[in-house]
Each structure stands twice: as structure tokens, then as C-alpha cells.
Amino acid sequence: MADDKKTNEYTIEMDKLDHGNKDFEAPAPAVRPRGPPVAQLANNPILPVLAYCGSSILMTVMNKYVLSGRDFNLNFFLLCVQSIVCIVAIQTCKVSKLITYRDFNSDEAKKWFPITLLLIGMIYTGSKALQYLSIPVYTIFKNLTIILIAYGEVLWFGGSVTGLTLFSFGLMVLSSIIAAWADIKHAVESSGDATAKVSTLNAGYIWMLINCLCTSSYVLGMRKRIKLTNFKDFDTMFYNNLLSIPVLLVLTFLMEDWSSANIARNFPSTDRNGILFAMILSGLSSVFISYTSAWCVRVTSSTTYSMVGALNKLPIALSGLIFFDAPVTFPSVSAIVVGFISGIVYAVAKIKQSAKPKTGVLPMSNPPVSASSQSMRDSLRS
């Protein structure tokens, strides 16, 4: 009986089938569920590229807006606010499981502290240069840092420079010469005190030279130190900003004027909210740059990211012409175009080098630590 009951459980009762349906077709294949719209949007290559470019432009424009105030002289305070905002932002992202990075370790902090000092020198001199120079000129002159880094790697890491890379360096130098000539020519020919304008430009060029030296020292030192700590993208950002906060606080209170009169000059009542908002937004933009560049590499490729980084110089330079009173002359536009072409040639040279086997040729993309370490350096240079 038990066996009959089991058999009956698996018996197909044919009389319950639909005899009117003579076509026994195979069932249609199951349709794979499509990913959610948000996931499809996140994997669209256009979105991360636009987000990366927008973040770079945002950071440069916000910094220039704050620094272009007529009497602004609290540069260390600006950098301290940016570091605090950055730490709060990435810690919030870590708690939200958007990013991951190491917890604080005192031994790692001691190893990394010299790099943080180089970073402070780099961002401070960069802020001073941007204060005196227009965004297009500042962007063009930042290309010279690439040359110093390249030959620093030749000296200390046993690399070499290819012919195409050398050609791009020549274009970078040429664009810088044209930009400086255009700036000085405009200052001399424009109305007002030409001597004061030229002296302001000269101060900007001196700060720019110091910034190029500090930036190359920071990048080369970071490459060597990363080998000891094995830091990833946001590890570097976390330690850089966390360790720089106490140093910047000491420097701003010791070296900058915190009298009520100077605070009123730096933060006039009519623009106070706008300046503070720009400070916060510039700090957030450095996080945006690192996140969007890693996103760009993940969705596209490192080759595409290299080209985007080169092409991004043009909209950053143009933002100075659009949002600020940078002179629009034939020499200044020519300098932007030549600098733009030099960036493309340099990116192509990097791509060709990465496609070849490693035979002692200088890795012009700098240390291939991770997908967005280069992007973080770009954010600091912007």
C-alpha cells in the first residue's frame, strides 16, 4: 500500500491535459533580469569621465575664487579647512561602506609624516601661485612638474625617456614660454600700474617654480615611501590629510594674522558665506576627484583615463577664461592650445610605453601603485 501511494504521488493524469492543444512547443527561454537602472548608469563610461572632469574643474575654480579675494592671506587656514572636510567626507564614506582604507596606525604615521610635510609644501606653494597667476597660466606651468618627475625617476629609479616623451616635454616648455610672454605683454599694454602688475606676475612665477620643485619631490618621495607602507588610494588620502591638520593649525596661528581687522578683510560680510562654502566645496572636490578617477578606470580603462587626464587640461584652462577675468588674447589662447597638444602627446607616449615590455624604459605614468593614485596626484596639482 505504501508503495502504491508513493507511485500515485508521481502519476501524471493524462485526462487532465488539454487535448485541444496539439502544439507542444518548447517553453520560451527565461528572460534574464536586467540590472537595476542605477547599476546600468554607474557602468556607463560617459558618466565617470564627465564626473572626473567636473570635479577637477570644480576644485580649481573654487580655490581660485577663494584665493582671488582682494585681501585674502589665510592660505594655511584654507588648506586646514580643506583637510578637515576631506577627513570628515572619507570617514563618512567609510562608515557608509562606499570606500575602505586602513585604520590609523602610529608606526605607519611616523613613516608617512615626511611625505605629509612635502605635501604641505606642495599645496601651500600651489595656492600662492594660483593666487597670483590666472588659471590658464597656472595649468600650463603645472605641466613642467611632469618633466621634473620624469628626470627624477631617471636619476633615482633607473629609467629613461623616449623620443615621443621628450617631444611632449618640448611642447610643454614652449607653451609655458608663450603663456608667460602673453601674460607680461597683457600686463604692460593694459591700463593701470604696469610695474605693479608685472611684479605680481613675477611673484606668481617664483611661487610656481617652487611649487614644481615641491610637487616633484612629493611625488618621487611618495613613490619610494609607498613601497614601504603598501598604501592604497584612500590610505594615502587619509594619512595625508589627517597628519597635515595639526601642522596646518600650528602654521596658521603662528604665521598668519588672526586679528579681527584681518579676519574682516579676508571674510567681508557681503561674501563671507560664499567664501566659506567655496572652502568646503574645494575640500570635497579632492575626494570627488579620487573617487571619480577610480570609477573612471574601473568602468573604462587606464588608457582611457590617461587620455581623459590629458584632455582635461583644456576645460580647466578654459574655466579661467569663463569664470574669471583672465585675458583672452591670441598668445594666451595659443599657449592653451600648445599645452593641450603637449598633454595629448604625453598621454600617447605613456600609452605606447605601457604597451611595450618593461625593458628599463621610464614608466612615465609614475608608480603604478593603484588605479587612482595618479588621480589623487592630479587632484593635488589641479
Curated annotation (Swiss-Prot):
GO biological process: fungal-type cell wall polysaccharide biosynthetic process; GDP-mannose transmembrane transport
Bias type Polar residues, positions: 367-382
Disulfide pattern: none
Residue ranges annotated as Cytoplasmic topological domain: 1-40, 93-110, 152-160, 222-233, 296-303, 349-382
Gene Ontology CC annotation, any one: endoplasmic reticulum membrane
Keyword Ubl conjugation set for record: no
Keyword Protein transport tagged: no
Lumenal side: 62-71, 128-134, 183-200, 255-274, 325-327
Region of interest called Disordered, as start-end residue ranges on this chain: 358-382
Coarse class of the protein's main subcellular location: Golgi
Record-annotated membrane-spanning stretches: 41-61, 72-92, 111-127, 135-151, 161-182, 201-221, 234-254, 275-295, 304-324, 328-348
GO molecular function: antiporter activity; GDP-mannose transmembrane transporter activity
Similarity field: Belongs to the TPT transporter family. SLC35D subfamily.
Subunit field text: Homooligomer.
Subcellular location: Golgi apparatus membrane; Cytoplasmic vesicle membrane; Endoplasmic reticulum membrane
Pfam family, one: UAA
Entry protein name: GDP-mannose transporter
First and last residue of the signal peptide: none
Record key words, sorted: Cytoplasmic vesicle, Endoplasmic reticulum, Golgi apparatus, Membrane, Sugar transport, Transmembrane, Transmembrane helix, Transport
Membrane topology (UniProt): Multi-pass membrane protein
